[in-house]
Design a protein with these regions (language model features):
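Alpha/beta catalytic cores of nucleotide-metabolism and tRNA/nucleoside-modifying enzymes
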Residues: 3-4, 9, 15, 120, ...
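Active-site beta-loop-alpha junctions enriched in small/polar residues
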Residues: 8-10, 38-40, 69-71, 96-98, ...
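Flexible, glycine- and charge-enriched loops at secondary-structure boundaries
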Residues: 111-115, 175, 242
Length: 313
């Protein structure tokens, strides 16, 4: 069983990957970091700023898997060629993102609206590229039963691994992941399958492994942002200490300040991390409200110093 980190836009960028690997990485935990999605440019001219996220020199440690968000199979295949020139072997296709700004363009889980278009995309894509390609998907748009037809399509192609997030597009991240629907589809999958969705504790990881020992991997997202040591604990390591969390968060903050050129921009990114992480501190609710109101670096630093006077749960 392998453990992966989910691609989360605005959270699991190269600054985070470097800090997470340094502070909480353990052998095989994670085995792979999936980078947030990259949209291939229609003019086929790569944007240096966006490609910096995937500079191999900026991604040491565990392997990084680029993820593509596209609806044009030929364009996606071209992008795979460019990524392989950088040294990446596996590339992941995103048919799972439920964001309205993404699905309105027919991308992400919006690709699942029309199985015929999905099949046409995969036909075009696989006719133009070779090598390992994985897929991240949802069960459908409105009903889990839609996945029967979607899986029939996936099974026709040389997908090296299928990561299933058992929600439908319309749910976004509301409600619970449909574990029953996930279990029902497993016998029909002709490729290795990875589970993703609502894993927040080492006990949940262990229970999922026991229930589905044939899985190739488990991918964690929001649970790992809330508990950066989650995967380390899954392989027998220690929970995150307050000192580790402080060092990790300081590294993120300074890294984002250097990247964006202003602490105020870094504060915005850090608040996205604290949205999940603050609940690890006992009695932090009043400070959470203060943190949300911060705009400047000095304001952020004052509130964070106060948070770290609290005990961990």
């Amino acid at each position: 069983m392998q453990y992966y980190t989910a691609p989360m836009e605005g959270l699991t960028d190269r600054i985070w990957r470097q800090a997470h690997q340094r502070w909480f990485g353990a052998p095989g935990a994670p085995a792979r970091y999936y980078a947030p999605f990259l949209s291939p440019p229609e003019n086929r001219v790569l944007i240096k700023k966006k490609m910096a996220e995937l500079d191999p020199a900026a991604n040491p440690g565990a392997p990084v898997i680029p993820q593509l968000l596209a609806k044009d199979g030929a364009l996606a295949a071209w992008m795979v060629t460019e990524l392989r020139r950088l040294g990446y072997t596996e590339v992941n296709l995103n048919f799972g993102c439920p964001s309205g700004t993404v699905t309105a363009k027919g991308k992400g889980s919006g690709m699942l609206r029309d199985p015929a278009k999905l099949e046409a995309f995969l036909d075009e894509f696989f006719s133009r590229t070779e090598g390992p390609v994985s897929v991240k998907t949802r069960l459908g748009v409105t009903r889990p039963e839609e996945f029967d037809a979607i899986l029939d399509i996936y099974n026709r192609y040389p997908i090296c691994e299928l990561t299933i997030h058992p929600r439908v597009m319309r749910q976004l991240y509301r409600g619970e992941a449909d574990r029953a629907a996930f279990a029902a589809c497993l016998p029909r999958c002709r490729m290795p399958v990875c589970y993703n969705g609502d894993i927040t504790t080492p006990a949940q990881l262990a229970a999922l492994e026991a229930e589905h020992p044939s899985l190739s991997g488990i991918m964690v997202g929001r649970g790992l942002i809330a508990d950066p040591a989650l995967l380390r604990q899954a392989v027998g390591g220690a929970p995150a200490s307050k000192e580790e969390l402080r060092g990790y968060l300081d590294e993120l903050y300074h890294g984002y300040t250097a990247l964006f050129g202003a602490s105020s921009c870094a504060v915005s990114r850090m608040k996205a991390h604290w949205h999940y992480l603050i609940y690890r501190f006992e009695g932090a609710e009043p400070l959470e409200k203060q943190l949300r109101k911060t705009r400047e670096g000095w304001e952020y630093e004052v509130v964070v110093n106060q948070i770290f006077t609290l005990p961990l749960k």
